């Protein structure tokens, strides 16, 4: 038994059957320099050449420092890339806790508290040799002599203070840096020194319940617990209530339902409606809380129809039955129409084709809950859109000449058409409001057998009169 350390490597006779290649185990480079083969695991404390100062051992020391600096640089880059993946808002949330957080002394000074989270200090002579994988990396990359550098690194770390287990990711107790090098390589750098007490102290004030689930993100420099109960998982209706506190929750719920549950779309609709109310419609109601919304949302194809009184056609859905044409919108400063400022006033259009109650207001009771005012903005909007729809159909029919319908004399048909009648007196227009408040359905203006013929006759007569 020679005195070169234990365990030993005995070279036996060649085996007849070839064996499978074994995984390479790291050897002590200092012992190899002196002609001895020793396994590196559990050997560095007992190596007889750990204090040798020959040329080869000095070269191993210098190479060890270079490799330690490289490993420290890689670890720092890995930490920075991990921090860049986590958004800034998540780093300061109270639910985030590092795996090493909360293990140090709570009564430590602030500088010690900043150094409490240390992910395997990358000091040139301390951190890399404590990991077995760093040793293997050194052995595999640099060959035989660099294996000695890894062993030398482990010797320099653990010889004055005793052997330690492999502690790549185990947190060290908080200690103040002895020299500026260690402070420079420690985790809380200049940009992280302000964020760390924020991420560390709140869990003490607000302890996380054990039932709360969290996801663990592991990296080269450590791991971070991210809770599932982040603010981003809040229901969309709650987010809308926070962003638009002036609106009623039923209004927000209807708009969100009309957008198909899309939170971003609902926010865009609300913002666009707010800007449109402030700029294009100064006569509209400035307080959206005063709008009375139906309790059920199936009255309209798009819920925005029950939201704002006089709005641009961009807010109406494309397939809506009550869509207002872009060219026939009401404008507040238009000379063609006079809009009454009282809540009972219905906009009367001085158009060539005055409108009658072709579409009675059948939905008024379901739209309004207060019987004080018979007309609210939703009723006015519904009346406007249906009247404009009819006017739009008549105008569009007047633009085309049908080659299949015979020409008729325009005078009699034009006067007999109830839609194209001359302007009614003022009393008839005022009585329109009282007449439309009834709940029963009104008889149609046309009988079923005359409806198609009367419409085609009126269209042809308008074409003849326009050409004459």
From Swiss-Prot:
GO molecular function: DNA-binding transcription factor activity, RNA polymerase II-specific; metal ion binding; RNA polymerase II cis-regulatory region sequence-specific DNA binding
GO CC, any one term: nucleus
Biased composition regions of type Polar residues, renumbered to the chain: 157-169
Major site of localization recorded for this protein: nucleus
CDD domains in UniProt: CUE_DMA_DMRTA3
Ranges for region Disordered: 96-210, 408-468
Gene Ontology biological-process annotations: male sex differentiation
Location of this chain's protein in the cell: Nucleus
Record-annotated DNA-binding residue ranges: 28-75
InterPro entries with a match to the protein in the record: DM_DNA-bd, DM_DNA-bd_sf, DMA, DMRT, UBA-like_sf
Keyword Signal appears in the UniProt entry: no
Name this protein carries in UniProt: Doublesex- and mab-3-related transcription factor 3
């Amino acid at each position: 038994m020679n005195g070169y350390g234990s365990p030993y490597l005995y070279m036996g006779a060649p085996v007849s059957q070839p064996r499978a290649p074994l995984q390479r185990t790291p050897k002590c480079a200092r012992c190899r320099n002196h002609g001895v083969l020793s396994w590196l695991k559990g050997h560095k404390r007992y190596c007889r050449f750990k204090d040798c100062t020959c040329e080869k051992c000095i070269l191993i020391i210098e190479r060890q420092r270079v490799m330690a600096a490289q490993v420290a640089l890689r670890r720092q880059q890995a930490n920075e890339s991990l921090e860049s993946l986590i958004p800034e808002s998540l780093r300061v949330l109270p639910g985030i806790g590092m795996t090493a957080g909360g293990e140090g002394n709570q009564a430590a000074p602030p500088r010690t508290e900043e150094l409490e989270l240390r992910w395997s200090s990358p000091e040139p002579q301390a951190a890399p040799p404590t990991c077995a994988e760093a040793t293997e990396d050194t052995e595999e990359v640099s060959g035989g002599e660099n294996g000695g550098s890894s062993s030398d690194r482990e010797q320099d770390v653990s010889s004055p203070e005793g052997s330690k287990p492999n502690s790549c990711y185990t947190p060290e107790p908080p200690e103040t840096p002895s020299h500026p090098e260690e402070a420079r390589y420690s985790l809380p750098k200049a940009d992280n020194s302000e964020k760390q007490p924020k991420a560390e102290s709140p869990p003490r004030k607000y302890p996380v319940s054990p039932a709360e689930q969290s996801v663990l993100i592991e990296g080269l420099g450590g791991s971070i617990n991210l809770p599932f109960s982040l603010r981003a998982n809040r229901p969309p209706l709650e987010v809308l209530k926070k962003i638009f506190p002036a609106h009623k929750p039923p209004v927000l719920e209807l708009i969100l339902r009309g957008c198909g549950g899309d939170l971003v779309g609902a926010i865009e609709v609300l913002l666009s409606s707010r800007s449109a109310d402030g700029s294009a419609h100064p006569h509209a109601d400035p307080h959206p809380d005063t709008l009375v919304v139906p309790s059920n949302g199936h009255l309209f194809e798009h819920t925005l129809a029950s939201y704002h009184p006089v709005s641009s056609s961009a807010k109406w859905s494309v397939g809506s039955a009550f869509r207002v044409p872009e060219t026939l919108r009401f404008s507040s400063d238009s000379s063609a129409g006079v809009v009454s400022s009282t809540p009972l006033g219905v906009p009367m259009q001085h158009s060539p084709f005055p409108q009658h109650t072709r579409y009675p207001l059948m939905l008024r009771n379901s739209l309004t809950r207060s019987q004080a005012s018979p007309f609210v903005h939703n009723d006015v909007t519904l009346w406007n859109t249906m009247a404009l729809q009819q006017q739009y159909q008549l105008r569009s029919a007047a633009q085309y000449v049908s080659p299949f319908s015979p020409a008729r004399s325009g005078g009699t048909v034009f006067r007999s058409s109830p839609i194209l009648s001359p302007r009614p007196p003022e009393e008839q227009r005022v009585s329109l409001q009282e007449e439309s408040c009834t709940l029963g359905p009104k008889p149609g203006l046309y009988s079923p057998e005359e409806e198609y013929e009367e419409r085609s006759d009126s269209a042809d007569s308008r074409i003849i009169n326009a050409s004459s």
